[in-house]
Swiss-Prot record:
InterPro entries: 4_helix_cytokine-like_core, Somatotropin/Prolactin, Somatotropin_CS. This is Placental prolactin-related protein 2. The keyword Disulfide bond applies. Placental prolactin-related proteins may play a specific role during gestation. One of its GO terms (biological process) is positive regulation of receptor signaling pathway via JAK-STAT. Disulfide bonds join 126-244, 261-267. It is found in: Secreted. GO terms for molecular function: hormone activity; prolactin receptor binding.
Length: 267
């Protein structure tokens, strides 16, 4: 088994992978590096700077009963609306994320998997199975916001490596439409944006999520290379990947929509 370690690059970003394992997160997380907590926290601070409306709302709440000229009724309503808008936009993005994942899976299935039995073991092969994330809405609704956002970020981080290597290999597949490649690129971009959203709204869950992923870091080694000599094996692996991405994107969409309806108080 290949040993992997999690590390963070202070300058980070989701470009090419840092070291053989590749990037894992929107914070510049990489496999194969060493821990740099100061670098991680600097990245988090920059995320937090974009979440000032949240902090201002909290400040106004703390000012109840005290004279706070900058936190009048109009200001509070405006800031609250701004926060709600952020969640609404995230819910729209997560919907598109799942929708595009479904379209990409359906196109791949139609072109490569007709008459095959790939679907039989597809669910069992998902690299995120070890996290036991809630499948059904009623179970997800029983979770508090912190746990729900934690599972959302776990799933999103878990797909950074597979998506990176998937994009590298898709370009070498014969007769694959440009639409599938474009969809994969857009899905990767959407995932980065959703990660940034969760990181900015639920800052304190980031380190626990990274530790959780570190405990099952063996799940990444499978994607260090997706090149197979047998074409049928290769197509089977891609099928499983598309299948699992569709499943996990549905979970992400469901979790974010629950968080949004709670923020809007419409649940």
């Amino acid at each position: 088994m290949v040993e992997t370690r999690l590390g963070w690059e202070a300058g980070g970003g989701l470009g090419a992978p840092g070291g053989p394992g590749g990037k894992l997160g929107g914070l510049g997380l990489a496999v194969g590096g060493t821990h740099s907590w100061s670098g991680l926290l600097k990245r988090v601070d920059r995320r937090e700077a974009r979440a000032q409306p949240r902090l201002l709302v909290l400040g106004c709440l703390l000012c109840q009963g005290i004279s706070c000229p900058s936190c009048g009724p109009d200001m509070f309503v405006s800031l609250q609306k701004s926060l709600i808008d952020v969640f609404i936009n995230a819910a729209s993005l997560s919907h598109d994320f799942h929708n595009l994942s479904t379209i990409m899976f359906n196109e791949f299935d139609e072109k490569y998997a007709q008459g095959k039995l790939y679907y039989i073991n597809a669910t069992k092969s998902c690299h995120t199975n070890s996290f036991h994330t809630p499948e059904e809405r009623d179970k997800a609704q029983q979770m508090n916001n912190e746990d729900l956002s934690k599972w959302t970020l776990v799933l999103l981080y878990s797909w950074n490596n597979p998506l990176y290597y998937l994009l590298l290999e898709l370009r070498n597949m014969k007769n694959l439409s440009e639409a599938v490649i474009s969809s994969a690129m857009e899905i990767e971009n959407m995932s980065e944006k959703l990660q940034a959203f969760i990181e900015s709204q639920f800052r304190k869950i980031i380190v626990p999520v990274l530790k959780m992923i570190h405990e099952v870091s063996n799940t990444w080694s499978r994607f260090s290379s997706m090149t197979f000599s047998d074409e049928d094996r290769s197509i089977s692996e891609y099928y499983n990947l598309f299948y699992c991405l569709r499943r996990d994107s549905r979970k992400v969409d469901m979790y974010i929509k629950i968080l949004t309806c709670r923020t809007r108080k419409t649940c």
